[in-house]
Amino acid sequence: MARLTCVEKLSDDLPDQYFNGKDITMKRRTFISLMGVMAAAGVLSMTGCSSKDTAASTASSATLNKLDSIQKSGKLVVALEGAWQPWSYHDASDTLVGYDVEVSRAIAEKLGVEPEYVESDWDSLFAGMDAGRYDLVCNGVEVTDERSKTYDFTTPYCYIHTALAVKKDNDEIKTFEDLKGKTTANSLASTYMELAESYGATVQGIDTLEETIQLLAAGRIDATLNADVSFYDYLNVHPDADFKLVAQTEDASHVAIPLRKGEASATLLDAINTAIDELRADGTLKELSEKYFGQDISAEN
């Protein structure tokens, strides 16, 4: 005896009155056919939904796993200025070198990929990362409350102080408070610009430390702010430079790597934090610090 389908069983369970007593057999067959079509359509619809859900889930996973995407591509796209010695700059052979270059290369190696460097002006670095053109910015970026609202920061990989520089014959500016009503030059949107403005200075936008020192020497600006270690490095290369350091911030700034905020960067953030911890533990960060700054800035003093 043939096994009844669910539709056939349903038709048998319905009373004859349901079919109005006319041509019951024919109407039962019509009912069975109609129900069969509806059932098949339902199965197909559910299958389609399932396929779409699976595809959406797969796409979502890919989007949410930035680290996986980077490792599949085999490259980590790093944005930096390339004109801020000793963080990132071009040596005599025009090779891109510097502390941030080597730190990011060591991190990329820990992730199992190759670094790809993209050079840009300071105020374009974050816009490029926001647009998805870069995976991260490694450019001596100081962690601030304002930046932390927009970006997720890694563990700090070095610590610096902001120093105030003036011409050697300037005895008027001795503290940050003396900047009120004065003119400084700094990269636009940098923490140095923000600090100078907070003390009442007018800031002229400039791209490189070299240009800033030239403006200072020419008397076109009254002072400038930058990382203490950047000034020390400049004086090592240019011992006769016409400027002196008169003040520096008491608390050290934390320098870290910003990533686009959100779940998409979570695995990448964890992986970079692990890499930084390992590079600090095995002495790599200390070695690179001493190579480029003449001192260890990888630990907070």
Regions found by a protein language model. Name each.
Residues 88-93, 104-113, 189-208, 235-239:
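Ligand-binding cleft/hinge of the Venus flytrap
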Residues 50-52, 56, 101-110, 170, ...:
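Extended ligand-binding regions for polar small-molecule ligands
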Residues 167-183:
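Flexible hinge/capping segments at coil-to-helix
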Residues 117-127, 171, 189-190, 204-218, ...:
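Short helix-initiation/N-cap motifs at beta->coil->alpha
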Residues 141-149, 195-198, 222-252:
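A ligand-binding cleft/hinge motif common to bilobed small-molecule-binding domains
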Residues 159-166, 232-273, 295-301:
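Periplasmic-binding protein-like
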Residues 1-26, 30-46:
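N-terminal secretory signal peptides
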Residues 59-140:
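Extracytoplasmic small-molecule ligand-binding "clamshell" domains
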